[in-house]
Amino acid sequence: MQLLTIVWTSLAAGIMATATPTSLPLCSMVDRPCKCPPGTTFKNLTTYGVIGAPARDVQDIMGSSAVFDLQFQGGLVPSSTKGKDNVPGAVRSFNFSGPAGYYVISEQVCLRLRMNSGHVADVYKLTKWKTSPDGSFNQQYQQSPKPPVVQVPGAGAYHGGWTSIVGQQTVVRNETAIAWKNWRCETGETFPSATSHEGGITNTSAVLEKQGKLTGVSIAAFTIFNEVRDD
């Protein structure tokens, strides 16, 4: 039921986003209907799934230590790191291969909050990190500084990207609903977000299963494109 609620909320936001682009604010970390720079494409998608484990255990994999330790993303290993894991100022960098060459992606932690309830460079900044007593969490990060144009050799270019990963403890003690949302402005196809995020949720279940913590029912990850629009 909670997963359906999360899905419906996201779909409703997508429906609202059909407003005339010229009347919308520029895209930012604020999750709302928005417009991209002229000549680029706006993409808004969310990957959903249920992991059969308590949110606290899911958070250990996808949240609280997931700046430098990315085992849930297929063993992705940073090529370099700076600072302390998941602490403001920490930086992780990756060497990725595009269709026509290599490029470097760096992601930086900016803010962490707790709640009691060709070579190119692409920098992302963690803008929000919230947790609740039941283990639910919300992690948000964005391309930073003010979105530069980042060329991916042979694939296109980033003109801004924003991500939110929500892990919500359900009424079932050992089940966590996941909503992994990405909205971005780009030309071409910079990154297969749907495939990557679905794999990340699946891998998290696999890691927890190896740890003997996957005791509930998991629902396979799936992605809904809320909106794709040329601006």
Curated annotation (Swiss-Prot):
Swiss-Prot/TrEMBL induction comment: Expression is induced by the azasperpyranone cluster A-specific transcription factor ATEG_03638 which is itself regulated by the azasperpyranone transcriptional regulator ATEG_07667.
Keywords assigned: Glycoprotein, Signal
Glycosylation sites: 44, 95, 174, 203
Pathway: Secondary metabolite biosynthesis
Reported phenotype of the disruption mutant: Abolishes the production of azasperpyranone A.
Signal peptide: 1-19
Biotechnology: Azasperpyranones display potential anti-cancer activities. Azasperpyranones A, C, D, and F exhibit potent growth-inhibitory activity against the A549, HepG2, HCT-116, and HL-60 cell lines, with IC(50) values of 2.39-14.42 mm, respectively. Moreover, azasperpyranone D significantly inhibits HCT-116 xenograft tumor growth in BALB/c-nu mice. In addition, azasperpyranones A and C can bind with four kinds of therapeutic targets for cancer, eEF2K, FGFR, survivin, and TNF-a.
Keyword Signal: yes
Function: Part of the cluster A that mediates the biosynthesis of azasperpyranones, members of the azaphilone family that exhibit anti-cancer activities. Azasperpyranones are synthesized by 2 clusters, A and B. Cluster A is responsible for the production of the polyhydric phenol moiety while the azaphilonoid scaffold is produced by the cluster B. The non-reducing polyketide synthase ATEG_03629 produces 5-methyl orsellinic acid, which is then reduced to 5-methyl orsellinic aldehyde by the NRPS-like protein ATEG_03630.
Protein name: Azasperpyranone A biosynthesis cluster A protein ATEG_03636
Organism: Aspergillus terreus (strain NIH 2624 / FGSC A1156)
